[in-house]
């Protein structure tokens, strides 16, 4: 009988929790990848409709989207207004395809949305188990069991990405108000 009461209470709390979450949904996009996701094209080549959002009209290095908030590769779970600004090989202000995607999502949604992104160029999908260096996107359980996140000095991009998602949920997404 006590077990049944506890089970009913758990189900009630779960239903109330899910109802609260469902009544206040937010849009969250999760993006991960390698060089093509991390930015390889100079901001000078942005489409004109995105350049129009720039506050720096010489190199298009600064600006902000109205609704898109992003947490990218920082391991802190903190969102900032999105602007294409990847840095590669001494070149600043590079962009990837997602800059266009987020722009059109803004036009469609017309409300704040969040992006959790972990994208690193020069990485590999399949780990070389004998490599002492490198950063890898792998979900192989035997490899993950011995790997550490790149954000902690290891070589697993997936574990870093998972940490970033957790931090974003804990610091921001779970605390949003309607």
Language-model regions, residue ranges each:
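Sec/Tat signal peptide C-region and signal peptidase I cleavage site
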Residues: 18-22
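Cell-envelope and extracellular/periplasmic
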Residues: 23-178
């Amino acid at each position: 009988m006590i077990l049944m009461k506890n089970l009913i209470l758990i189900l009630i709390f779960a239903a109330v929790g899910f109802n609260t979450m469902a009544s206040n949904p937010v849009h969250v996009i999760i993006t991960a990848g390698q060089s093509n996701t991390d930015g390889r094209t100079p901001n000078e080549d942005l489409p004109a409709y995105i350049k129009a959002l720039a506050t720096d009209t010489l190199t298009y290095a600064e600006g902000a989207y109205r609704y898109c908030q992003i947490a990218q590769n920082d391991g802190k779970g903190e969102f900032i207004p999105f602007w294409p600004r990847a840095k590669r090989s001494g070149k600043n202000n590079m962009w990837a395809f997602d800059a266009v995607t987020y722009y059109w999502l803004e036009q469609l949604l017309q409300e704040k949305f969040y992006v959790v992104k972990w994208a690193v160029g020069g990485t590999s999908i399949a780990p070389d188990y004998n490599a002492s260096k490198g950063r890898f996107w792998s979900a192989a359980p035997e490899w993950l069991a011995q790997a550490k996140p790149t954000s902690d000095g290891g070589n697993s991009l997936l574990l870093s990405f998972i940490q970033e998602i957790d931090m974003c949920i804990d610091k921001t997404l779970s605390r949003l108000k309607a």
